[in-house]
Amino acid sequence: MDSKPLEYLLGLNSDGSVKKVSEVFENLTVTNTVCAFIALFIIVPRVFDFLRNLFSPVISIPGPLINKFSPWPLEIATFKGKSHRFARALHRKYGPIVVLAPGMISIGDSQEIKRIIQSEDWAKSEAIYGNFRQDFHRPTLLAFTEKKAYSRRKRMLSSMFGIRYIRSLEPLMKSCVDAGVAHLNKLCDNPSKSTVINLQHFIHGLAIDTIGVTTFGGSFHVVENGSHPLPSRLKAGMKISAVMQLIGWIKYIPFLPKRDPYIEKFTFDIVDKRRKEAGAVKYQDLLQHLVDVCDDSPGSEFRTSDVQDESVILLAAGSETTANAELFTVIQLLKHPEVMKKLIAEVDKWYPPSEPDRVTECAYSQTGMTYLQACIDETMRLIPGQATGSPRETSKQESLLGYKIPRGTTVFPNTQEAHLDGSIWEQPEKYIPERWLEIYSQNQTSAMPYWPFSAGSRICVGKNFAFQEMHISLTTLLRKFTFEYVPGQDETTVFRIAQQLETDSYKVRVKKRF
């Protein structure tokens, strides 16, 4: 670039002497002004970024040189939904600590991960979760980065996720599963022949209906009707949110609404309806708990907009993560018929085929059906929902595996790497539920480097809800139906908020057992 625009910008003569202010403005042209603007607002900041990254301690951490100076490789991978594979490839090549982007690293060492998310309980990354908010100043429980504010919100909502309350939701969950069973019965009208169904659509529909009835007081009937506008809009929103976590400038695009207009109206109307019905109708769902603690007075920490945002997170994150865990569990069972056979034997032991009308009860069978739990745990070990972990941030200079980590660095505690660590797990990439039976017998589950729901203060509050839903759904479906593997299905995963199948379809054969 010609150096003259920079001379004008700095107010210098060609010999380096300082110009008078009047001379600077008299000699400015449109071209010089544009070039000076580019230099001041684009080139100069990039130079400072380059120098800051060059002299940062992060420069010594293993990883491609481009990652240490540019966020583009990570942003491109994130945009494609491949950030989990991007990180996995880097760890395989460079080891347990790698640079993902300037100011962002990934750690795959299980001891350091435990230290970050559990022992020292580092705060969530503002660089990531600051972009995961519909209102920057009013985060949801998921997106709080300030520990004290998070603790206040968690205490406010904690009663919604206790074992006792989750157990009270069991009849609502069963009603959705019963609707799913009735739907499959219609499809399997010939008991001697199997029917091909889209398992992904069915399980996701079942999870969405379950969240609908337990959160919003009514099923969305996705299983029976095939679709509903709200879940469809939420799924599209999740794709955008996944990209915005790392590409935050998207939210500054003019005329881009903070909230989807349909979702905004839906959630506002249902909250308004609850308030108008106060006292007349008694609801026992999660939304009612949110409405009960809502306060729109000045200075309130939990207003109507917060109820809307929290309910959307419950619906989107709750249905998506649980559905994917269920779906991947069934896929693994179909690909490992010997495991499926063993699990069916356990199901029949607890719920004999001679008692087809017996209701599936968590209080009766959830803790006793250890092989089912082993199958679920093994699935979440191999295909964790939070594949790259919940990103944390250094509040001071830290040391990880001997490397200095500057204050304000985003650290991804890569649970995917810990779950596949060959020094801890025998044959780590194979599906072996039996490994968990020994772990259970020794009461060592919490001691293992296994964090599908994270850990510490930021452990997923919906963990018990998810396990109860999965137990009811999988046990009931395996009691009633036989599922058969259809070869040739695309099992490629993408990571958008949660790890999920890239395709919208996964076909299986299903028929009635009896």
From Swiss-Prot:
One of its GO terms (cellular component) is membrane. Its EC number is 1.-.-.-. Heme binds at C460. It is found in: Membrane. Induction: Expressed under high amounts of nitrogen via regulation by GLN1. Moreover, components of the fungal-specific velvet complex VEL1, VEL2 and LAE1 act also as positive regulators of expression. Finally, expression is induced under acidic conditions in a PACC-independent manner. It is an enzyme of class 1 (oxidoreductase). Pathway: Mycotoxin biosynthesis. GO terms for molecular function: heme binding; iron ion binding; monooxygenase activity; oxidoreductase activity, acting on paired donors, with incorporation or reduction of molecular oxygen. It is a single-pass membrane protein. The keyword Metal-binding applies. GO terms for biological process: secondary metabolite biosynthetic process. The chain crosses the membrane at residues 24-44. Glycans are attached at N225, N443. Its cofactor is heme. Belongs to the cytochrome P450 family. PANTHER family: CYTOCHROME P450, CYTOCHROME P450 MONOOXYGENASE APDB-RELATED. Cytochrome P450 monooxygenase; part of the gene cluster that mediates the biosynthesis of the mycotoxin fusarin C. Within the cluster, FUS1, FUS2, FUS8 and FUS9 are sufficient for fusarin production. The roles of the other FUS members are yet undetermined. The fusarin C synthetase FUS1 is responsible for the condensation of one acetyl-coenzyme A (CoA) unit with six malonyl-CoA units and the amide linkage of the arising heptaketide and homoserine, subsequently releasing the first intermediate, prefusarin, as an alcohol with an open ring structure. This is Cytochrome P450 monooxygenase FUS8. The lineage of its organism: Eukaryota, Fungi, Dikarya, Ascomycota, Pezizomycotina. The gene is FUS8.
